[in-house]
Amino acid sequence: MSIDTQSIIENNKRSAHDTGSPEVQVALLTARIELLTKHFKIHKKDHHSRRGLLQMVNRRRSLLDYLNKKENERYKLLIEKLGLRR
């Protein structure tokens, strides 16, 4: 169980060498969150990793809020592309 970082970056980058834009960061966090969510269906008592999951969710929320405030159109496209709520 792992994420394919390179393909996620390729699908969400804004320019040729982009790896740090909010879109890429949110997409990577979303993949890691989905992976951990599957992990918790099996390992219900893994509270240490649950803390990491909550930190990732909060970090993603912050990045999405930033993107929404700065460039609303990019925010809307990203939400639709990743299938996130809102």
Swiss-Prot record:
It comes from the Bacteria. One of its GO terms (cellular component) is cytosolic small ribosomal subunit. InterPro entries: Ribosomal_uS15, Ribosomal_uS15_bac-type, uS15_NS1_RNA-bd_sf. Keywords: Ribonucleoprotein, Ribosomal protein, RNA-binding, rRNA-binding. Part of the 30S ribosomal subunit. Forms a bridge to the 50S subunit in the 70S ribosome, contacting the 23S rRNA. One of the primary rRNA binding proteins, it binds directly to 16S rRNA where it helps nucleate assembly of the platform of the 30S subunit by binding and bridging several RNA helices of the 16S rRNA. Forms an intersubunit bridge (bridge B4) with the 23S rRNA of the 50S subunit in the ribosome. This is Small ribosomal subunit protein uS15. It comes from Xylella fastidiosa (strain Temecula1 / ATCC 700964). The gene is rpsO.
